[in-house]
Amino acid sequence: YISVKSLVDEIERVYGERNPRITLVSGTTGGKAIDRREGIVKGALGRVESFIFTLDDPNFEDPTDIARQMQSYVTDPAAQTQIVMPREDAVAEAIADAREHNDRFNVVLVIGKGDETRNIINGKPVPYEGDSVVVRRVLGE
């Protein structure tokens, strides 16, 4: 909660005068830190306009169930929410959505994986190219 809140605080501090449209792409781990599901959302509520929930180390849990639970914590009626699997598609959707709203200054926050190159699914590491690689690919860099 604190790290997401701090991140959004910093976005508002740096870009606030530009009235940023903030999109948050996030999931959270399965089988542990259950309170993180609510905390991530709580840290962004009222300031993030679009939430995209996705896979992030679900382990033995269904990633869609985790995403639905996170989605249930979004109490801001003005916020858009969606669940997009797999994670690569969620990142691509967030960037496409930002491009569609090019009348605003957009900030897309993709949190959770960073440069990690695996997801834990059913107790096993499954290769993942990493958020930074996906973002650069989608942006055409």
Task: Please give the residue ranges for each predicted region.
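ATP-dependent carboxylate-amine ligase
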Residues: 1-141
